[in-house]
Design a protein with these regions (language model features):
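Beta-propeller and closely related beta-sheet repeat lectin domains
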Residues: 20-23, 222
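Short edge beta-strand segments in beta-sheet-rich domains
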Residues: 3-5, 19, 47-52, 140-142, ...
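Extracellular/periplasmic catalytic domains that process cell-envelope and extracellular macromolecules
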Residues: 26-28, 199-200
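Short, glycine/charged-rich beta-strand-loop motifs at protein surfaces that mediate ligand recognition
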Residues: 8-13, 21-22, 41, 207-213
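Beta-rich carbohydrate-recognition and catalytic domains
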Residues: 1-15, 29-72, 181-184, 227, ...
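Lectin-like carbohydrate-binding module/patch detector with strong preference for beta-trefoil
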Residues: 70-251
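Hydrophobic core segments of beta-strands in well-ordered, beta-rich domains
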Residues: 25, 31-40, 76, 163-164, ...
């Protein structure tokens, strides 16, 4: 600061302004949050309110990250950039084949090709549990996830727990007793189907099941982990390993 450094931690937002004070709390290695107040929260009659946000460090300075809110995403492994998906057979998209054997296609006007839909493939999927795997993202239904806050399930510092389901279905990501990752046909609200999602200090995310079947209490140790290029599992969180880190990409 003496030499002209410094960076704004947080400015005004669409519905709040006047950020003040800064309280840093270290949850875990690479997991930090800050408390502050808004002088005026427009959703709360313009009153001063307390707020909590993750801390992201950039060039040695803390800046406010974003509390995860859910939505439709593909879930990217920081390790290789591959996507979390269902272990199902790959189904080709419906389109007219192109190649040297069909040269007159070049005389036809170009037209958009529709994305593959859930209805085109869901009947090819098993009806019971389907394990998860990691593979290159191809914008297919078995790679598209809806992440939804479950306010009635409790939470952790900064957020409620979330359910993670295949978009357009009730099929839910779940932890297993042997510390693996599967999907169950329908979300039931069981603790192993609830997920803690936190932004890390480098901007990536940690994803942890609320509970692991057969283990007592709330899980505070094991996270979704990329054990290899194609194998998601549950393992002890390690901030120094990209295997513990994920990104959320809107589609």
């Amino acid at each position: 600061m003496l030499h002209g450094g410094g960076k704004m931690v947080i400015a005004a937002e669409d519905r709040a302004c006047g950020a003040g004070h800064f309280g840093r709390f270290i949850v875990d290695e690479g997991v930090e949050v800050m408390s502050f107040h808004w002088e005026a929260d427009f959703e709360m009659s313009g009153r001063s309110v307390l707020a909590v946000r993750p801390i992201v460090w950039k060039n040695g300075w803390p800046v406010a990250g974003d509390n995860f809110k859910g939505g439709n995403f593909w879930i990217e492994s920081e390790r290789r950039g591959y996507a979390l998906e269902l272990t199902v057979d790959f189904v080709r998209m419906q389109q007219e084949r192109q190649g040297w054997f069909n040269r007159n296609q070049m005389e036809q006007p170009v037209k958009p090709i529709a994305n593959q839909t859930l209805a085109e493939v869901i009947n090819t999927w098993p009806k019971n549990d389907i394990p998860a795997r990691i593979s290159d993202y191809m914008n297919r239904p078995h790679q598209r996830w809806t992440i939804t806050p479950v306010n009635e399930a409790g939470g952790y510092l900064s957020n409620p727990y979330f359910k993670i389901t295949i978009e357009g279905t009730d099929r839910a990501l779940a932890a297993t007793a042997d510390k693996e990752v599967t999907t169950v046909p329908a979300y039931t609200g069981a603790d192993e189907q609830l997920w803690r999602i936190e932004q890390l200090t480098d901007g990536t995310y940690r994803i942890m099941p609320k509970a692991i079947p057969g283990q007592e209490g709330i899980n505070k140790e094991f996270c979704l982990y990329s054990a290899g290029d194609s194998t998601p599992t549950l393992a002890k969180y390690d901030f120094n390993s990209d295997n513990s880190k994920w990104n959320f990409k809107r589609h």
